A protein has these predicted regions:
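N-terminal amphipathic, basic-rich helices that act as targeting or association modules
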Residues: 1-81, 204-207, 212-224, 238-241
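Glycine-rich ThDP/TPP pyrophosphate-binding loop and its adjacent helix/strand module
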Residues: 110-282
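Short hydrophobic/aromatic-rich motifs at helix boundaries and adjacent loops
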Residues: 23-26, 95-100, 200
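Residue-level signal for pocket-adjacent positions within structured domains
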Residues: 1, 7-10, 37, 86, ...
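Cofactor-binding active-site loop characterized by glycine-rich and histidine/acidic residues
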Residues: 41-164, 282-283
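Solvent-exposed, non-transmembrane amphipathic alpha-helical segments
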Residues: 40, 47, 71, 75, ...
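Non-transmembrane, interaction-prone segments in cytosolic or luminal domains
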Residues: 8, 74-81, 85-87, 96, ...
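Generic structural signal of hydrophobic/aromatic residues within well-ordered alpha-helices
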Residues: 2, 6, 31, 75-79, ...
Length: 283
């Protein structure tokens, strides 16, 4: 398996799209292996596998900084940062790996101890300000789900990012869900953006002063790489709005998104993934 050999995101750099998709499939299997034995967040992680692979392919962590909101969707990130054993081994191996981002566990790649909703943008603006004071040039990327956007601290973070006016990338992982369905005025605009492929007249993010990119195919690695490449090294506050499917790749989690948000251990048969005989660079 590729993921048994990946020790850092740099190991993705020489892979072509076919191989990256195999890596994504292996990660999905590994996530299911862990949650089936240990319990944990199912749907949020499965829906963000491809985006995580694309983010780590395009950006250069640990120089570039990722901040995960709640961080319940960070399992794929952990697999790609040298912690695959916590997803492939037995329960004792899994107990070593937290279900959330943890600097104590991996200070190089986990920037904050997180577990609450709506915090990622404000935390990222702290990194943004510190970078600007130091005169550095790393990318700061906040990842937040549509469900977390209704939290007050998310509003504060958007306000501060816009006020600072320098480079920050906010990836809005829009799966049309929080734990359950979303309700409220924000979600009417998100729906209008989805239905218009990001082109509707009233754009909540542009009103805040953000550059804005929309991607309908939020579980397509090739398309994700293209949109992330287009905003890499930006010097402006930028939102990348991706439409994903919660539970993607696991039919029970897609069929019942609320039930499969988090789960106790369940029966799951781990399957191997066919690998190509050669690896070609994506270029």
């Amino acid at each position: 398996m590729y993921i048994e050999k990946i020790q850092s995101p740099a190991d993705l750099k020489g892979m072509d799209i076919k191989t990256l998709n195999i890596v994504a499939d292996e990660i999905r299997q590994a996530v299911l292996n862990r949650v089936s034995k240990h319990g944990g967040h199912v749907g949020p992680n499965l829906g963000f596998v491809e985006a995580t692979v694309a983010l780590h392919y395009v950006f250069n962590a640990p120089k570039d900084k990722f901040v995960f909101d709640v961080s319940h969707q960070c399992y794929p990130h952990k697999v790609l940062t040298g912690r695959a054993s916590g997803f492939l081994g037995d329960v004792d191996d899994m107990n070593v790996i937290s279900g959330y981002s943890s600097p104590a566990e991996c200070p190089e790649y986990d920037n904050f101890e997180v577990g609450h909703t709506s915090t990622s943008i404000s935390l990222a603006t702290g990194l943004q300000k510190a970078r600007d004071i130091k005169g550095n040039n790393e990318n700061i990327i906040a990842i937040i789900g549509d469900g977390s956007l209704s939290g007050g601290e998310a509003f504060e973070g958007l306000d501060e990012a816009s006020e600072l006016g320098t480079g920050i990338i906010i990836v809005v992982n829009d799966n049309e869900m929080s734990i359950a369905e979303n309700h409220g005025g924000i979600y009417k605009n998100l729906r209008a953006l989805r239905e218009s492929n990001g082109s509707c007249e009233h754009n909540w993010f542009k009103a805040w002063g953000f550059e804005y990119k929309y991607l309908e195919e939020g579980n397509n690695i090739e398309k994700l790489i293209e949109v992330f490449e287009s905003v890499k090294d930006t010097d402006k506050p930028t939102v990348v709005h991706i439409h994903t499917e919660k539970g993607h790749g696991f039919a029970p989690a897609v069929a019942n998104k609320e039930v499969w948000h988090w789960g106790m251990p369940f029966h799951f048969v781990f399957r191997s993934v066919e690998q190509p005989k050669t690896i070609r660079n994506i270029q």
